[in-house]
């Protein structure tokens, strides 16, 4: 359906509508529209992992272009610089675009319980209307329940809202307000009135481990046909290799000359990357040899006094993430397969009321 058709239906009186439309995937980055050119995400996004990497690549390209202006360089050096510029441009052209979603939702829309792809953080600005969020913190127990629920291959016996009924917090967002949803927060969204939202997803340097954890789970679900490719943060592995090569390497190589402000945070980032970065067919910006080189160089750059030797893993793929455990069988010895529960306002109301929340 074209966006013009969505707008036409959106402007139809509610009692005349034959569909409840909830447009979630309309991303405008690079479209050249007035919105694309003029909209700026919240300042927090400037501190995101992607923004830092993007700015680094821009500066790196400028440095290479300046070096190419030097007529005294050898032909061999010139070829190296041209190839380097080409690789930078390829990465910049393929850079992920998740910061300019225009979300159009009719009253009655409901987005079921989820964690945003790759455990990315979210900003959510209400331009018009109202949204009601139900959020649960990513505690160890809550994430265990969520992962088992998402990867259940034999049916879900109970809706996760009811399973976690005491964990939900109700947050109402109205026109003019901006919400920030941190990494890995479990949430559902109800739309009580027609709404227009501008939102975006972004990664944070202090959440690398969480982001890898959920990305690996999503990749496992993709392999099993439980998730489609369009639901992934498509360039996640590429971004992580590029961030390691361009930013993390620079921080580690220059520790003595340019010490970072927060050494413990850098240690955590390095440890998270060291324990999770692995060769991947999805890391298409890099050949298999380049991926191996980056992983090995990361190990070589880690100061010897940071981690005990036994804490530094070998260069290998992480252990596979298991799908949900086998579920109980019924009296006939067959697994019970219960379809996804119907999401209705009345049912959501009952579940939240039991948790002490009311519409």
Report residues per predicted region.
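N-terminal accessory scaffold of Fe(II)-dependent oxygenases
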Residues: 1-178, 188-359
């Amino acid at each position: 359906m074209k966006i013009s058709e969505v707008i036409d239906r959106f402007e139809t009186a509610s009692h005349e509508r034959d569909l409840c439309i909830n447009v979630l995937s309309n991303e405008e980055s690079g479209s050249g529209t007035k919105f694309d050119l003029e909209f700026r995400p919240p300042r927090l996004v400037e501190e995101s992992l992607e923004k830092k990497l993007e700015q680094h690549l821009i500066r790196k390209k400028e440095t290479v272009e300046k070096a190419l202006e030097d007529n005294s360089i050898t032909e061999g050096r010139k070829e190296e610089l041209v190839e380097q510029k080409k690789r930078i441009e390829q990465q910049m052209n393929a850079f992920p675009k998740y910061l300019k979603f225009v979300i159009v939702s009719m009253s009655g829309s409901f987005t079921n319980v989820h964690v945003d792809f790759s455990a990315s953080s979210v900003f959510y600005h209400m331009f018009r209307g109202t949204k009601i969020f139900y959020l649960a913190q990513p505690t160890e127990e809550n994430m265990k329940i969520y992962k088992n629920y998402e990867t259940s291959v034999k049916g879900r016996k109970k809706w996760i809202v009811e399973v976690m009924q005491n964990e939900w917090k109700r947050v109402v967002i109205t026109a003019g307000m901006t919400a920030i949803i941190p990494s890995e927060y479990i949430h559902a969204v109800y739309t009580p009135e027609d709404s227009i939202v501008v939102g975006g997803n972004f990664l944070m340097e202090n959440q690398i481990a969480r982001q890898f954890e959920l990305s690996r789970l999503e990749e496992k679900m993709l392999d099993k046909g439980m998730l489609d490719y369009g639901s992934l943060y498509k360039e996640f592995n590429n971004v992580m290799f590029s961030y390691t090569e361009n930013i993390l390497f620079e921080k580690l190589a220059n520790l003595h000359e340019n010490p970072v402000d927060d050494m413990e945070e850098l240690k955590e980032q390095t440890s998270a990357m060291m324990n999770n970065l692995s060769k991947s067919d999805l890391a298409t910006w890099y050949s298999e040899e380049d991926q191996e080189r980056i992983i090995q160089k990361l190990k070589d750059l880690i100061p010897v006094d940071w981690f005990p030797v036994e804490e530094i893993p070998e260069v290998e793929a992480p252990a596979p993430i298991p799908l949900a455990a086998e579920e109980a069988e019924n009296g006939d010895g067959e697994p019970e397969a219960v379809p996804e529960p119907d999401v209705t306002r009345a049912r959501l109301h009952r579940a939240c009321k039991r948790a002490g929340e009311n519409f």
